[in-house]
């Protein structure tokens, strides 16, 4: 017998979300961003399912990329953070990786390595101030990369700070800065669009888009679910009721006795906790479903368990009943909101303890 906690991942939903991203920006090629274990969905399984259709994959670092190559992935793979040590350029050449480049040290190390790289994505700091060169320096970097004889093509890339906030003018300012840099360089392919940008902003035609969170059916925008904006949520996290007990009015539950029964009712204990990735800071009232009926968190989240109550106390929970923690009509975005965080964090913090089950177009495994 196994602990009844399962993350069911709909791979076909991820593929359809990728196709939707390309439909929204039809002149662009698209990465499938599978960093951080495909946002907690399983990078190898997701990439294997998408490999025959995607234009390329994108990950954060070289160890993620090597793991995909070792799993048989043949599509191009971009390192979004570039290399961290000069020796990694040789590995990029060996495995055919593309890489971001954002500073003089990386450029010097590339030139010293003599490695041949098909595509280098030069990171422009258009205002986020994490990584990248400025618009005055960008033409110098592009010339150096082209003159090195080591790089097949240079792409100019940037990242937007506030694309998920349609009322914020920062994105327009960053786009203008990017275009100024691009014009000073001359003809060069562009990559500017993350999920929020793909869905709501105009981007340069013919470049590369980088759908990330939207691939997994999760909204990049606050206060709306992925399903409500045309995405297909890919993950359902489910478990079972493993114990029930009758509470009397005034009984207190859990660590810190953080839940007090306002009336007599049946309490259910469910096999999931923060040791699995369920958010410890989820508050009383966080939604879930038991046997298809609305229920909510009642008491502090433990490492391995939570305690819950039915919304309608006449619906008494029973041992072995199915529990949906998020997915379906329990949006992960809503659960995240109750925990004071975002859907990105919930899925990427999934641990190795849940059993993963993958649904494909023609069946399941």
Swiss-Prot record:
<dbReference type="InterPro" id="IPR001608">
    <property type="entry name" value="Ala_racemase_N"/>
</dbReference>
<keyword id="KW-0413">Isomerase</keyword>
<dbReference type="GO" id="GO:0030632">
    <property type="term" value="P:D-alanine biosynthetic process"/>
</dbReference>
<dbReference type="InterPro" id="IPR011079">
    <property type="entry name" value="Ala_racemase_C"/>
</dbReference>
<feature type="modified residue" description="N6-(pyridoxal phosphate)lysine">
    <location>
        <position position="35"/>
    </location>
</feature>
<dbReference type="GO" id="GO:0008784">
    <property type="term" value="F:alanine racemase activity"/>
</dbReference>
<feature type="binding site">
    <location>
        <position position="303"/>
    </location>
    <ligand>
        <name>substrate</name>
    </ligand>
</feature>
<comment type="pathway">
    <text>Amino-acid biosynthesis; D-alanine biosynthesis; D-alanine from L-alanine: step 1/1.</text>
</comment>
<dbReference type="InterPro" id="IPR029066">
    <property type="entry name" value="PLP-binding_barrel"/>
</dbReference>
<keyword id="KW-0663">Pyridoxal phosphate</keyword>
<comment type="function">
    <text>Catalyzes the interconversion of L-alanine and D-alanine. May also act on other amino acids.</text>
</comment>
<protein>
    <recommendedName>
        <fullName>Alanine racemase</fullName>
        <ecNumber>5.1.1.1</ecNumber>
    </recommendedName>
</protein>
<feature type="active site" description="Proton acceptor; specific for L-alanine">
    <location>
        <position position="255"/>
    </location>
</feature>
<dbReference type="Pfam" id="PF01168">
    <property type="entry name" value="Ala_racemase_N"/>
</dbReference>
<dbReference type="GO" id="GO:0005829">
    <property type="term" value="C:cytosol"/>
</dbReference>
<dbReference type="Pfam" id="PF00842">
    <property type="entry name" value="Ala_racemase_C"/>
</dbReference>
<dbReference type="GO" id="GO:0030170">
    <property type="term" value="F:pyridoxal phosphate binding"/>
</dbReference>
<feature type="active site" description="Proton acceptor; specific for D-alanine">
    <location>
        <position position="35"/>
    </location>
</feature>
<dbReference type="InterPro" id="IPR009006">
    <property type="entry name" value="Ala_racemase/Decarboxylase_C"/>
</dbReference>
<dbReference type="InterPro" id="IPR000821">
    <property type="entry name" value="Ala_racemase"/>
</dbReference>
<feature type="binding site">
    <location>
        <position position="130"/>
    </location>
    <ligand>
        <name>substrate</name>
    </ligand>
</feature>
<comment type="similarity">
    <text>Belongs to the alanine racemase family.</text>
</comment>
<dbReference type="InterPro" id="IPR020622">
    <property type="entry name" value="Ala_racemase_pyridoxalP-BS"/>
</dbReference>
């Amino acid at each position: 017998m196994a602990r009844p906690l399962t993350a069911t991942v709909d791979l076909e939903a991820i593929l359809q979300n990728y196709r939707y991203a390309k439909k929204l920006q039809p002149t662009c090629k698209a990465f499938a961003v599978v960093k951080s274990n495909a946002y907690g969905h399983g990078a190898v399984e997701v990439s294997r399912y998408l490999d025959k259709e995607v234009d390329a994959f994108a990950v954060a670092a070289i160890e993620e990329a090597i793991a995909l190559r070792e799993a048989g992935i043949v599509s191009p793979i971009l390192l979004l953070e570039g290399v961290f040590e000069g020796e990694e350029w040789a590995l990029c050449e060996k495995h055919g990786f593309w890489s971001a480049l954002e500073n003089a040290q990386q450029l010097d190390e590339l030139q010293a390595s003599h490695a041949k790289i098909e595509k280098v994505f030069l990171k422009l700091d258009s205002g986020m101030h994490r990584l990248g060169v400025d618009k005055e320096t960008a033409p110098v970097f592009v010339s150096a990369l082209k003159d090195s004889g080591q790089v097949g093509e240079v792409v100019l890339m940037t990242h937007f700070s506030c694309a998920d906030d349609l009322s914020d003018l920062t994105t327009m300012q960053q786009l203008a800065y990017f275009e100024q840099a691009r014009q000073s360089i001359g003809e060069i392919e562009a990559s500017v669009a993350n999920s929020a940008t793909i869905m709501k902003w105009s981007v340069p035609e013919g470049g590369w888009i980088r759908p990330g969170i939207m691939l997994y059916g999760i909204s990049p925008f606050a206060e709306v679910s992925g399903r409500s904006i045309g995405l297909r949520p890919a993950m359902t996290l489910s478990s079972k009721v493993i114990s029930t007990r009758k509470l009397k009015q005034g009984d207190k539950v859990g660590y810190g006795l953080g839940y007090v029964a306002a009336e007599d009712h049946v309490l259910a204990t469910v096999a999931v906790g923060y040791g699995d990735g369920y958010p410890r800071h989820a508050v009383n009232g966080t939604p879930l479903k038991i046997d298809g009926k609305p229920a909510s968190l009642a008491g502090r989240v433990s490492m391995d368990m939570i305690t819950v109550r039915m919304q309608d106390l006449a619906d008494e929970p029973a041992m072995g009943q199915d529990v949906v923690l998020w997915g379906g009509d329990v949006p992960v975005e809503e659960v995240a909101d109750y925990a004071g965080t975002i859907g990105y964090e919930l899925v990427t913090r999934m641990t190795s303890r849940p059993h993963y089950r993958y649904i494909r177009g023609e069946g399941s495994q």
